[in-house]
Amino acid sequence: MAEKKRYSKRYCKYTEAKIEFIDYKDVEMLKHSLSERYKIMPRRLTGNSKRWQERVEVAIKRARHMALIPYIIDRKKVVENPFKI
């Protein structure tokens, strides 16, 4: 039987930094919760608390709707920075 992966304990960076609001226009801050294909990363990888993970998801979805962040990128078209295409 395959062993489960053990993830290291991560702490919510938003709680530690005492941030009160996540702005959807701050793309640099939102990139920490996105994978290289711009998919939203789960809580177990980012270490966000439930409260902040929900707020990050809403901010990312708003930024996608406003075309500040791309939706999902194809495997063939993965580049380092899609904003400079």
UniProtKB/Swiss-Prot annotation:
GO terms for biological process: translation. Pfam families: Ribosomal_S18 (PF01084). GO terms for cellular component: cytosolic small ribosomal subunit. InterPro entries: Ribosomal_bS18, Ribosomal_bS18_CS, Ribosomal_bS18_sf. Keywords: Ribonucleoprotein, Ribosomal protein, RNA-binding, rRNA-binding. The keyword Cell membrane does not apply. Disulfide bonds: none annotated. GO terms for molecular function: small ribosomal subunit rRNA binding; structural constituent of ribosome. NCBIfam families: S18. Binds as a heterodimer with protein bS6 to the central domain of the 16S rRNA, where it helps stabilize the platform of the 30S subunit. Belongs to the bacterial ribosomal protein bS18 family. Part of the 30S ribosomal subunit. Forms a tight heterodimer with protein bS6. This is Small ribosomal subunit protein bS18. It comes from Wolinella succinogenes (strain ATCC 29543 / DSM 1740 / CCUG 13145 / JCM 31913 / LMG 7466 / NCTC 11488 / FDC 602W) (Vibrio succinogenes). The gene is rpsR.
